[in-house]
Amino acid sequence: MHFEAEESKEVATDVFNSKNLAVQAQKKILGKMASKSIATTLIDDTSSEVLDELYRVTKEYTQNKKEAEKIIKNLIKTVIKLAILYRNNQFNQDELALMEKFKKKVHQLAMTVVSFHQVDFTFDRNVLSKLLNECREMLHQIIQRHLTTKSHGRVNNVFDHFSDCDFLAALYNPFGNYKPHLQKLCDGINKMLDEENI
């Protein structure tokens, strides 16, 4: 009996994969430390400014600091985990193809966000909400094999908030309280587009 236990340990060692272990460790560590302050060291300055502005507008809209922190923390964790999976070549060909589609969809979303702000009377909350939900579905498919149900819940938490038509209508209201936030968000997104980071 004791011999069988040792033998099974050897078998387990044969399938040991340090690369997978490293990716798991990175995901676990970053999952624990992916707060807004830590993420600023892992995310460039422009992205950090956009995240900060998303936090401010979310906090003001929800009137709930804790909820705003949770949404932005979930966004940061998702972005970081996605980057780790991508950089460590964890995606298969189908997932890589989907990742390319996802990048294009996010780029389209960014262009639409800015365009709706810059061109008067073009804003359509249903268009933005649809784009956000298309991004959500692609993201779920990309991470399906790799991340936990909890991570999928984080994705939903983020997209449930940002794709909410009432939130989008408030954000884009030309006479509303969020106009300065939208201006800063669009400035940051424009910069990210110029730097080809989105």
Swiss-Prot record:
Cytoplasm in keyword set: yes
Family statement drawn from the similarity comment of this UniProt entry: Belongs to the TNFAIP8 family.
Organism: Bos taurus
Residue stretches in coiled coil: 49-83
A Gene Ontology term for the protein's cellular component: cytoplasm
Localisation: Cytoplasm
Record key words, sorted: Apoptosis, Coiled coil, Cytoplasm
Presence of the UniProt keyword Coiled coil in the record: yes
Protein name: Tumor necrosis factor alpha-induced protein 8
Role, per record: Acts as a negative mediator of apoptosis. Suppresses the TNF-mediated apoptosis by inhibiting caspase-8 activity but not the processing of procaspase-8, subsequently resulting in inhibition of BID cleavage and caspase-3 activation.
One Pfam short name: DUF758
Main location as per UniProt: cytoplasm
UniProt record, GO biological process: apoptotic process; regulation of apoptotic process
Single GO term (MF): cysteine-type endopeptidase inhibitor activity involved in apoptotic process
